Every structure is written in structure tokens, then in C-alpha cells.
Curated annotation (Swiss-Prot):
Keywords: Coiled coil, Cytoplasmic vesicle, Endoplasmic reticulum, Endosome, Membrane, Protein transport, Signal-anchor, Transmembrane, Transmembrane helix, Transport. InterPro entries: SNARE, T_SNARE_dom, v-SNARE_N_sf, Vesicle_trsprt_v-SNARE_N. It is a single-pass type IV membrane protein. This is Vesicle transport through interaction with t-SNAREs homolog 1A. Residues 214-217 are vesicular. Component of the SNARE complex composed of syn7A, syn8A, vamp7A and vti1A. It comes from Dictyostelium discoideum. The keyword Iron does not apply. SUPFAM superfamilies: SNARE fusion complex, t-snare proteins. Residues 90-109 are annotated as: Disordered.
Amino acid sequence: MDVFERTEQNFQHVCNSITRRIKQLPNYGGEKKKIAVREVENDIDEALKFISEMEKLAQNHPQRIKLQTKTKQYHSDIQKYKREVQLAQLQSSNQTNSNPWSNAPDDYQSQYDNQRQHLLQGSNMLDSTSDRLLRTHQISAQSEQIGQNILMDLGKQGEQIRGMRDKLHETDDQIKSARKIMTGIARRLATNKVILSIIILLLMGIIALIICLKWLR
């Protein structure tokens, strides 16, 4: 397990604590709810610190793009936790129709319901937008990864082509060297042939001269 994975494990532990505390918020009221909310907010701050640490670790990691996508998702999760805390603060302790304005006139009750409804709608819109942005980021990250893989493949192919070119240059040099050697051998053979012809002619001349001298005697 590397440093990123250990940090991620600590982050997940804090997220589990956040989820548990948020579920308990509607059961509290008054000062207890304020204390519970502060505890959740402290956990959220701690989770954000872990995310920041993971972002730094991801920059130099071999799987940088994959890990950066993870941290984006974790940021989105934290935003959802924050909205859930806001919603929980509006919910009643018994999760029914009671709320801080339950004994108030109808216009206050209606105002409370409208605010809660708007907050729920806004939360749903933010969740939907966050999901779309995350999917877009994932597609972008995948495209970037594919592009990097293609560049790596092209780089390897380029190295292979350069290696083949170098070998061709070496082969061409060897052919030129062999050609020079063969040309030298051919010249030596031609020279030797001329010398041999001259020697033969000289021998024939000497033999003819000896025969002539014998006839003259």
C-alpha cells in the first residue's frame, strides 16, 4: 500500500464518520444539534485536508490521471455532504411535519416549506450538475490517457524506425566498404593478370631466342 492509498483509506474512514453523523442530525434539537453540526463540519474539514494531500500525491504518481479523477469525485462527495448537513438542519427531530415554526402562523409554515423545497431543488440540481461535470472530466481524462498511450506508442515506433535507419546506414557503410575491397581485389587481379601475361611473353621470347640460336649453329 503506497502513501496515496493510505491517505485514501483515512479519507474513507472520515467519510464514514460524516455519513453516520449526518444520519443522526435529525434526531437532535437545540444545542445538541449545533454541537452535532460542528462535529460534522470538523470531519468535513479533515476530509478536505486528506483530499488536498491526495491531489499533491497524484501529481507525480504513475497513474496520475486515474487518481486525479478520484479526487474530483471526492470533492463532489464533500459538496453533497455539505448540502445534506444544510437539509438536516431544516428537518425536525422526529422527521415528520414538525419544525421550528410548527406552532407559527400558516404564512411562516408556508415560508419554511418553500425554503426547504427550494433548498431540496437546488441540492438536486447541484448533484445533477456535479455528476455531469464528473462524467465530462472522466471522459476528458480517458481521452488524455488514450492520447498519452498513442504518443508513447508513436515514440516507441519512432525509436524503432530510428534504430532501423541506423542499421540501414551501418549496412550501407558495410556495403561500401565491401565494394571498395572487391574493387581493390579486382584491380590486383587485373594487375596480376597483366604481369603474368608479360612473364609468359618474356618466357616465349626467351624460348624462341634459344631455338633460333640452336638453328644458327
